[in-house]
């Protein structure tokens, strides 16, 4: 090496690279070190910018600065080549040897040519509007000192003095021209550039039409390795422009969901094993990364080994210089290559993880679209999407570690064998003995994990139901009861989590304490084998055993990750193995035999479960001709809806066959419970179909929606909220019907669309829609309002799941009507069992929200997102949640743990100094009295640990010199073992305390969130999609439970580790602390630049999860409608679009993590390499102190590793704290229902304040938002105790607002409400609602038993429950389901809609409330049952005050008085007979129109 260098430079082999020649630097040193190396760096940096994405618009005009820089760069690439021409002249005319000049000139020319190309690329990118990257410009000036020094060299050589030789003079002229070109380049860079082009026009951003560039694709390999392509994204993050998912860069082609779905589907088929399909799709690429992992792992050992060799070279001083140079270059190169390889490995593994993630999530959604009748609860499916998919994909990071860590272990053990021989087996046996212990722990963790996930499923499912029925829960004051159920699930979940956390703590403690125990065991064995312990053996063994910490500590986590992946894989596989909806297998492949037949069923038996255990539906034979109107009637729960579900394929067909004509065109389906999307009314009706203005107008008219749209603030552009929350029941039914009609199908299945509307609207729907627009189609209509079936072609009578009669209406209808032909007698309206109702009086469930919406019609606001660093109050909130005392104890235990660890290091240093003092003059330390060399062994022997290794302190030898006898060794070992034991106890204490603190924080944060949300007003839920709330209860809570404590633990360990290292540095080598400020500044700048983007990307990632949750929940709710309309493909595309937005944020956050990692790694490598290089130069000058150099190198290695870990763990912890921030946002900022002051005499008045039941409204005004019209405008009336009051009025008249104000779900702006002369605003909400009862129009049931649904608070005996069921005609159903403990299923799915309404009525029968509010709750029951129920209500509540929002006239005309509302005012209040006798009363007009509606039904018969 020296010879080659001497030959290249023309120097002596003893000094091949002289630093000084005369009064200036050596020419060879100048050309190689000061010129060639900076030019090589310039070439590399320039190459990184060659792939800079171009702008999409036309090329901008070059400003003068860019032109000057381009021209200067091009000239600087030409001049070195011209400079080579004088080289051919005689030797005297050139300053250095031939090949040195050729090498330097070629490197310079290539560098500037590459730089010219890079500038050209930057000019045509958004950088063209500014000066471009600063780093690139600074690199261009790095070679300038070499030019200046070469010019000085010429001056010293007298090149300008006569005789002037043409060769040297020409070279000087070219040198001056090069300096001038560099100056011109500087002026070009200094010229003012315009403001940087806004990135909103960048192809990385904004609308799809402009997004032509894709992240990473098309970039150079240098740009990929350095992540230079991320610069625009990071710049936007620093400027605060990462506001929405589209602000991130587009996905590379290999990560796009559409591409990945195609790749995965090629290997996936129904019933296949998920892991096999994933392996076939992505396995080869993933396994190939193992090679990268292995090379990176092997190179990881090069650093410590080469450092040891370098210290040996400096210490011995006998090896040639070339060896030292090779060690330094090997150290630098090995560290850099290892950093790049390991970084690329991490990046590629994350990319494979993202690929598999899209495949899994797409497959889950596709399966959800194909689910058969046996469907898991929505909460469980959401958990598969949020929790299990993430845990499954942790496999990607764990698998390669599972073999990589044992490889590191094997290499370390081999090196240990080299030091202590067979004694290392004693330590190995001890380590192996802990494996079965670890196996037991891992098995317990896995079992607890499965149980915890089951409890989590139950909790999320319960929350889903709770959110869907929050209005009824508040009416019935069940917040406490259902909140307790959620808390019970959470307690069970935390119980399993507690087991997991403490087992994890035990696992970590065992492996953390293991190295010390292994060391002591090895040393004792070594002595017993008859060997003499020496400092060399002790410290080398300690260093090597410390290298075992990483693989031994990480291995349990890796195994745990693999086990968790297996658990989640099994859960996902079970979901994927559920029976699928298969039209090909369900329907007969042949159409009906007769062309005129639309539908035919023969000997068909159906059930909701595949084995027929639930109620069956049997159709012996049914043939429906094309164009017929078929009515389906029967008692509640007889199987009417099941028949329609059987036709649409939503049941299991056990036998027989079903044939449908033109099956591929699908069905027009209007379900009994209307399914409405969170979108505008127009979007709900169009349902993905192209807008046809003429057809759209016809559909609106046919479905009687024009009047409703004229009331709504933005017409058909009004957003209706999740599940149509801002609409009345009738409006939802009509929009669902309009959606079906707009699809223009041949076969329509209409499940009771007339139940929720009044007689006039029902009449309109019958004549304009069912008999009008749909007259040319085949229609099957289920209804209890039999008066509207007189025009049917045929009527089917269902009973107990069987089709018992088929015939014309005149035969079938009398069998089910309460009073036949009730419409025949006009004068018997008041007493007949028929139910005429008031024109256009359907209830508006959410009148307040209809008004509350802004004129743009937008109800649901974009989810808010915090910006900037995670605020300090979030950390304080987590501290408080953990408990101040517990948090302080954790910090104290951490500091004690670090102090004892440093104490152990100090004791080792003291032992070494005593050994060296006792062996003064030995060959190993001829200068033991020198303070600088007292720790000579420590750097040499402790360099094997690449991180978190604290080299012993440089301690002054004590006055007492110790011998190296065995007794002394034993003494030092005992003291060391004692200190290590104390450290072990502190470690255990810290692990246990931290587990307890994490559990306390998890419990506290969830409790606060749940309590706050249960106390939120209904307006919050109406404007907040449930997906947002569920996202917090699922993903964010899971993060607080698991991910955050794990990362916070690492952060705290790194922090106290850094404090301990700084303490060692400050006492051992104080001058080294001078390097910390600049190093800290660089680290802080890099991580600050990174954190600004990563924070926002993490938030955007959380933000884009919520729509995925909502979309999946929405899909599961509307599955029959989707499939009937053939919209599954469109919904799958929407899922891919939402998934792409989330994938963008995930990919960008992963890429930014790797961007930070490579920079921190390279900075650490640069620090170590620079110190090694300086040491080599000092060694050549005879100034190096080997011991000091070794210390510096080992400290540098530990310090950079710790700083990297600290930045990384802090950033990831901050990202996880976003989950705490989101929980705190809802725990603190969600509005709360008002809490009133207690009454003056709480004991007496609270018991007896409502004894009679009078209700009085006094000038009540309700305004939902300033500037909007009054919903209630000075309403005044009084209801006497025991009085029955009917409430009627048109849509938007304020009927529902009365109930909302009465129950204080909304607070009035003026006026007051009195109950028995007590102002309700002075009462606590629970106190008020406990005295009121409500029967809602829409039934709400939650999963659980009949008992839990009837009496959630457990206040009544079984006898009372059975009595209520008997009165509601549900006792037989309850017995068939297994009595009061029979399960109802999710949202009561085991009951028909009518049976659910009856069960809600049974609740009201149990109440002791003095005031009952009824919102016509029997719309979905047959007329005979309805008549009996009305009699039951009249009898049961005879002495109670009853307020009824009327839909059927029998509930009004039997009332004592009727209240008529119009535009929020009371216009009439009198008895029904008095109002009917007033010829111009509004009530009389409504009554007349309702009678006309009733008569028009059969008029055509």
Swiss-Prot record:
Deleted gene: phenotype: Deficient mice exhibit increased sensitivity to paclitaxel-induced mortality associated with weight loss, decreased white blood cell, and small spleen and thymus cortex due to apoptosis and/or depopulation of lymphoid cells.
Gene3D superfamilies: ABC transporter type 1, transmembrane domain, P-loop containing nucleotide triphosphate hydrolases
A Gene Ontology BP annotation from the UniProt entry: lipid transport
Residues where Phosphoserine is found: 468
GO cellular-component term (any): basolateral plasma membrane
Annotated InterPro entries: AAA+_ATPase, ABC1_TM_dom, ABC1_TM_sf, ABC_transporter-like_ATP-bd, ABC_transporter-like_CS, ABC_transporter_C-like, P-loop_NTPase
Modified residues (Phosphothreonine): 464
Catalytic activity: ATP + H2O + xenobioticSide 1 = ADP + phosphate + xenobioticSide 2; an S-substituted glutathione(in) + ATP + H2O = an S-substituted glutathione(out) + ADP + phosphate + H(+); 17beta-estradiol 17-O-(beta-D-glucuronate)(in) + ATP + H2O = 17beta-estradiol 17-O-(beta-D-glucuronate)(out) + ADP + phosphate + H(+); leukotriene C4(in) + ATP + H2O = leukotriene C4(out) + ADP + phosphate + H(+)
Binding site for ATP 1: 634-641
Domain ABC transporter stretches: 599-825, 1255-1488
SMART domains: AAA (SM00382)
Membrane topology term: Multi-pass membrane protein
Superkingdom field: Eukaryota
Pfam families cross-referenced by the UniProt entry: ABC_membrane, ABC_tran
Keywords: ATP-binding, Cell membrane, Lipid transport, Membrane, Nucleotide-binding, Phosphoprotein, Repeat, Translocase, Transmembrane, Transmembrane helix, Transport
PROSITE patterns assigned: ABC_TM1F, ABC_TRANSPORTER_1, ABC_TRANSPORTER_2
Enzyme nomenclature, EC number: 7.6.2.2, 7.6.2.3
Transmembrane regions listed in the UniProt entry: 32-52, 70-90, 102-122, 133-153, 172-192, 294-314, 321-341, 392-412, 415-435, 508-528, 539-559, 877-897, 969-989, 1033-1053, 1056-1076, 1158-1178, 1187-1207
Name of this chain's protein: ATP-binding cassette sub-family C member 10
Source organism per UniProt: Mus musculus
Gene, per the UniProt record: Abcc10
